[in-house]
Amino acid sequence: VGFKAGVKDYKLTYYTPDYQTKATDILAAFRVTPQPGVPPEEAGAAVAAESSTGTWTTVWTDGLTSLDRYKGRCYHIEPVAGEENQYIAYVAYPLDLFEEGSVTNMFTSIVGNVFGFKALRALRLEDLRIPPAYSKTFQGPPHGIQVERDKLNKYGRPLLGCTIKPKLGLSAKNYGRAVYECLRGGLDFTKDDENVNSQPFMRWRDRFLFCAEAIYKAQAETGEIKGHYLNATAGTCEEMTKRAVFARELGVPIVMHDYLTGGFTANTSLAHYCRDNGLLLHIHRAMHAVIDRQKNHGIHFRVLAKALRMSGGDHIHSGTVVGKLEGERDITLGFVDLLREEYIEKDRSRGIYFSQDWVSLPGVLPVASGGIHVWHMPALTEIFGDDSVLQFGGGTLGHPWGNRPGAVANRVALEACVQARNEGRDLAREGNEIIPVASKW
């Protein structure tokens, strides 16, 4: 018959160390921890097989297609320095395996099934190389960094934000008042917390109205463009779109979405709506630590960040390096560059396993948020540079005199740090002197 049934080792078909990767391949770097007795080549090949064309046995229908054309290939394996029984397995996927413009489909293929695999003790997706041929099928961020600056008329400094606290329990009117005080004091943006959607104590429509009122009042009094990230995340895509439409009708500049809990399909729909209707889109990464916190299992945040740039968002939370949530400096700056820059060189010391060419896909502003305050300002200005959003929740509202003085303090500290930097002073060394001097006037 010509068909030979039976179970074969994956590595016979899917481990191909002599394979030359193509410019159109999607490349993945997996951190593989095989079960005892499973050779790393077999583990790497198993990942390649199960995330592409393979199954546990040879099947009759394999003969009806060209496996060589469609199969994923594990083309290189290296041990992880300093770790026992951990390997980086590099896998190449032919572009034809993926639907155009669908982050959902890309993830379903690459990480959909392999993580429960018996032969592996643990598996982590460390990085993806997205070829231009694939990234060009995505719209990407609704507007990007330059267009956002032009819309807001704010240049040469990071933007300032603040998450309104207490995150749950305020009425819409009181919430709007808190927004107004922060914006009036000098912040560029205020923010709905990620879990503020439409609860019994504050329905979304009421919140949108009072926040819009606060924005327009603060704009009129300061002469600056202001915004509040109105969280459009909802239980259905239709409801989410309804909220975004209402925000557009109010004439506000920006809405917000929780892209991991909301899902990539919803996020991409919202990003398309935002581009078509001139809304900026702020992205919160609620649930990311469930996926990315374990060092040897899950998906590294740099992959989730790349996926967001493809799906679409103008801001995304990216850790602080200095605040209350964890993040190592070089690694964080690695994916901050992946969000902002057009071309990023491979650099293993920053966790970047592949050179990434975004071919003019718009950039995303990284948002530093979580446990930061005025005294972190010199470090944040130096680490993140101008193209970022610095978000102080408790660091604004926790000011002993209240919201507006807290906002003033943040704006003064930021302007002082930017000026000092532009004058050539060393923020890391002199930061603690710059801020008290600025606060005197």
Curated annotation (Swiss-Prot):
Post-translational modification: The disulfide bond which can form in the large chain dimeric partners within the hexadecamer appears to be associated with oxidative stress and protein turnover.
Sequence positions bearing N6,N6,N6-trimethyllysine: 4
Residues bearing the modification N6-carboxylysine: 191
Record's GO cellular component terms: chloroplast
Keyword Disulfide bond carried by entry: yes
Catalytic activity: 2 (2R)-3-phosphoglycerate + 2 H(+) = D-ribulose 1,5-bisphosphate + CO2 + H2O; D-ribulose 1,5-bisphosphate + O2 = 2-phosphoglycolate + (2R)-3-phosphoglycerate + 2 H(+)
Residues binding substrate: 113, 163, 167, 285, 317, 369
Pfam families linked to this entry: RuBisCO_large, RuBisCO_large_N
Cofactor binding note from Swiss-Prot or TrEMBL: Binds 1 Mg(2+) ion per subunit.
Major subcellular location class: plastid
Compartments, record wording: Plastid, Chloroplast
Superkingdom in the source lineage: Eukaryota
Gene Ontology MF terms: magnesium ion binding; monooxygenase activity; ribulose-bisphosphate carboxylase activity
Metal-binding keyword on record: yes
Active site (record annotation): 165 (proton acceptor), 284 (proton acceptor)
Gene3D superfamilies the UniProt entry points to: Ribulose bisphosphate carboxylase, large subunit, C-terminal domain (3.20.20.110), RuBisCO large subunit, N-terminal domain (3.30.70.150)
EC number(s) recorded for this UniProt protein: 4.1.1.39
Family to which the UniProt record says this protein belongs: Belongs to the RuBisCO large chain family. Type I subfamily.
Known function: RuBisCO catalyzes two reactions: the carboxylation of D-ribulose 1,5-bisphosphate, the primary event in carbon dioxide fixation, as well as the oxidative fragmentation of the pentose substrate in the photorespiration process. Both reactions occur simultaneously and in competition at the same active site.
Assembly with partners or alone: Heterohexadecamer of 8 large chains and 8 small chains; disulfide-linked. The disulfide link is formed within the large subunit homodimers.
Protein known as: Ribulose bisphosphate carboxylase large chain
Lineage: Eukaryota, Viridiplantae, Streptophyta, Embryophyta, Tracheophyta
